[in-house]
Amino acid sequence: MKWTAKDLDMYIQSKEYVDTVLIPLVPITFGSQIKQTGSVNEFLTILSSEIEKQMKGRILLMPTFHYLSDEEDKIDLLKRWTNKVKENNFKHIFFLTSDIEWKKEERELEHNLVWIPAIPLETLENNQAREMINQQVLQILDIFTYNWKNEKK
C-alpha cells in the first residue's frame, strides 16, 4: 500500500495484516552531483513502487525519506521516523537506498538496510529498464521473505 488516501483507507481496514514498512532513503545534493541524485531518486521511486505493487496488502510504502547528503543529523531524524513506525505495531522495517553512506551506519539503524546500486534508467530503453527493475524487485523480495520466515517469534 502506498501513502495515498485511497491506500491508507485500505490499510486502516486491514492493518492487522500489514506488518512491514518500506522506507526509501534518497539524498538531495546540489552542485556537480545534482543529476546523479535525481537519477537515484527516479530509480528508487520506480523500484519501491514495483516492490509495493508485488506485495500490496503486506507492505506499507512510506513517503521517501529525503535528506541533504551532508546532513549530520539524518540518522537521528530517521530513528525518530522508525520509532513512530514501531509505535504503530509494524514488525518489519526495511530501508531501501543507493547511498553507500548508509552502509556505514547500518548497525545504528537496527533494521534491515537494503543497499542497491542505482541503475541510470535514462540510459536504457523502456523494456530494458523494466527488465532490470523486475530483476532487482525479485532479489529484494527474496530478502523480505527471508526476514519474514526468520523473524523472532
Question: Language-model segments: which ranges?
Answer:
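Extended, histidine- and acidic-residue-enriched regions that form the cofactor-binding/catalytic faces
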Residues: 1-153
